[in-house]
Amino acid sequence: MSERNIVEFNKSQQKYHVSIRAYNDRSNELTTDEATTRLHLDLASGNAPDMLNLQYLDIYNLVDKGVIDDLRPYFDRDTEIDIQDYVESVVEACTIDGVLVSVPLEYVIYSYFGKADMVGESAGWTIDDVAECLNNNPGSVFSTWTREFMLARILQYSIDTFIDSDSGTCDFTTKTFDELLDIIEPLPSEANYSPVEEKTSLINNINLYNFEVIQEYYAKYGDDIIIKGYITADGRACHNLSVTDAYSIVSTSGCKDGAWEFIKFCLINDNSSIGWFSSNKQRQQEMIDEELAHAGEEKRSTFYTEQGSVNYHYATQGEIDTVMNLIENVELSPSYSSGISNIIKEELDSYFLGGRSKEETVTIIQDRVQLYLDERN
């Protein structure tokens, strides 16, 4: 949690006092997995904190276990704050199975882009679409991505291509999974950066935290890039929402009123980083108004390309429209994608080393993932 938020809240209060319980810091030298295990043990034993900062947690898993309160009733009961004052797409993205887990103070968007003549003019694609793009552009590569990285990125939002979450079953004996293997097999096992390959890549990653950063990508790759988004099962436009200072209330808390007062204080007295995307509509509009008041005018701040230093300019209406379209299609990462991706990676490592046939590998993946799903259910 932001120490500044806590200090300011504690100064404003006589009734409540917030302190930090750190599960992973310099004093205990725990790994992330060890810290997460300790947190889940506390949640199970009734020794959990009153609030969680969800920034690095498996939010879907916490909702499945029923350990996070829905914040909508808190908003509904409070006359000092209104959920309608926050960006709808962000609120929707942070609502899992009907539970509003948090309203983040700020966020970053992660996505992928490519040249329009290679990936098409519109956002959104499937694994089949990627395979078709590669067939149509045989000289293209995947930036400097390794086989492992590409597999994880493809499956992050498209795992439902092979998983039926309603029935709890999987099917990897499909043409699409075969195409996935064909996509990643030519990739290296270790990264080897090459500016030339980056220029001829089918897709590259893009990270945005304000309305001006997109200028770097236009300057480096040209104005004809399309922010394609993550690969999904249905080909919808999808961009990753990475949250910071996203506080939730633990369902077993004995001080829920105090926890809500802290969350409300943080949202109303938003002291998050100047210039980062805000979940607050008014603050977002202030950012836009500031840009458009000087649209196109050069700024003193710079970024660097192969040709040298380039000055940022205040964002134009077109640049803002592009970014706003991304914001309208943000999603949190599905929880089980990483676990299933790890299973697939382990088995494919052996396959690519020649340890077993494709048919044997698919059978093992099918059995292991089905067991994983059975255990989760």
Task: Identify the function of each model-found stretch.
Residues F277-E346, S350:
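Long, aromatic- and glycine/proline-rich binding clefts that accommodate carbohydrate-like moieties
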Residues Q14-H17, G46-D50, V99, N137-V141, ...:
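Loop/turn elements at helix/coil->beta-strand transitions in domains of secreted/extracellular proteins
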Residues E92-S194, S251-D257, S357-E360:
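Helix-loop-helix "hinge/cap" segment bordering the ligand-binding cleft or interdomain interface
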Residues H17-Y86, K220:
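Extracytoplasmic "Venus flytrap"/periplasmic binding protein-like
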Residues D182-E261, N271, Q282:
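Extracytoplasmic/periplasmic substrate-binding proteins
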Residues L57-S111, D224-T232:
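Hinge/lid segment of periplasmic solute-binding proteins
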Residues S2-H17, I344, V362:
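Short, polar/charged alpha-helical segment
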Residues L30-A48, L52, Y60-N61, N135, ...:
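Short helices/loops that flank or line small-molecule/ion binding pockets
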